[in-house]
Each structure stands twice: as structure tokens, then as C-alpha cells.
């Protein structure tokens, strides 16, 4: 996403509220500048008191409210469209909007993402070329996700060929 990050103090508030502890009690290091920002949250690099380097995904403070408002607007437009268009009524666009809302609400629950990450990690464990981060469940909540820090590259960087040392043909062959 091309989204501006939200201020560190807001990230701190979310983390401390969710973990029921100060950042300093949980982490020995916590980067104030996010390494990535998206529409629903941002990621900070940190180090746990136990020494592990981690990625801390923090949900935007207003994410749930904004998503709910947007979903209500989408559903209202879909229902209105169905009222005036037989084709859209037959396409069941309001039902689609409701399902889309369910999917998007799941995106707001970082427990769901953590569970899916664990499932993927388990499924790909036998492949040397695949790395899926370990989830630190003790520090994961609905709005904060803490995982092992993994170096990586954005998919768009890979497809542009701007990442050194990556053989895309070999990677594609390994995948499938």
C-alpha cells in the first residue's frame, strides 16, 4: 500500500493497551519508524526481552471504525442498486457486499492472521526455500501481531528484478 504511517505515540498506545504492559516491559528495542505501513496497520521492528528480533504489526487505532463505516456505505449502495436494477438483484450484489464485509472483518482480527501464518508455516516446513515466520502467541492480540523477524523483499521488487541474489526462474520452479 502507498499509505502514510500513523504516529508512533498512537502505535505505542495500541501496543500497550493490547499487551497490558508498557513497550519497555516487553521489548528492549522498538523502532519508532515503521518499516511498512498499509491501510489497516503498520509494522515495527523490535527486539523482545528474550533477545529475539521480531516484527510487530500494529493495527491503526481507527481501522475498525473506518472499515465498519465503509462497509455500511457499500451495503447501502448495493441494496439501492438491487432495488433499481434487476441484473444487479439477480447478481446478488448485496449478498456479495455482506460476504466482503465478513472477509474484511477477519482481516481486522490479527488472531486470524496469526492462525493462518502458523498453518502456512506448518504446511511449508519441509521446504528449505520457504520461510514463514514464527508467531509469538504470548504477544499477539486482535490488534497486535508479533512474529519472528524475517528479511525479505516486496513482491513488486522481485518482479522488477531489483533484488540482488534472487533467481526468479529457480524460485518459480521450486513453487510449482
Model regions: which residues?
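Broad phosphate/nucleotide-binding scaffolds in NTP-utilizing and phosphate-metabolizing enzymes
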Residues: 1-176
Amino acid at each position: 500500500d502507498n499509505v502514510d504511517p500513523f504516529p508512533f505515540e498512537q502505535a505505542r498506545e495500541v501496543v500497550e493497551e493490547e499487551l497490558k504492559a508498557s513497550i519497555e516491559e516487553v521489548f528492549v528495542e522498538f523502532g519508532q519508524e515503521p518499516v511498512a505501513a498499509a491501510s489497516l496497520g503498520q509494522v515495527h521492528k523490535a527486539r523482545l526481552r528474550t533477545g529475539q528480533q521480531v516484527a510487530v504489526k500494529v493495527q491503526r487505532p481507527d481501522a475498525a471504525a473506518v472499515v465498519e463505516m465503509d462497509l455500511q456505505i457499500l451495503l447501502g449502495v448495493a441494496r439501492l442498486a438491487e432495488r433499481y436494477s434487476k441484473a444487479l438483484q439477480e447478481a446478488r450484489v448485496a449478498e456479495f457486499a455482506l460476504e466482503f464485509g465478513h472477509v474484511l472483518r477477519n482481516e481486522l482480527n490479527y488472531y486470524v492472521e496469526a492462525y493462518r501464518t502458523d498453518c502456512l508455516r506448518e504446511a511449508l516446513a519441509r521446504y528449505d526455500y520457504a520461510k514463514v515466520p514464527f508467531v509469538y502467541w504470548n504477544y499477539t492480540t486482535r490488534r497486535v501481531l508479533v512474529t519472528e523477524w524475517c528479511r525479505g523483499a516486496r513482491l513488486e521488487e522481485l518482479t522488477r528484478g531489483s533484488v540482488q541474489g534472487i533467481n526468479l526462474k529457480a524460485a518459480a520452479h521450486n513453487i510449482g
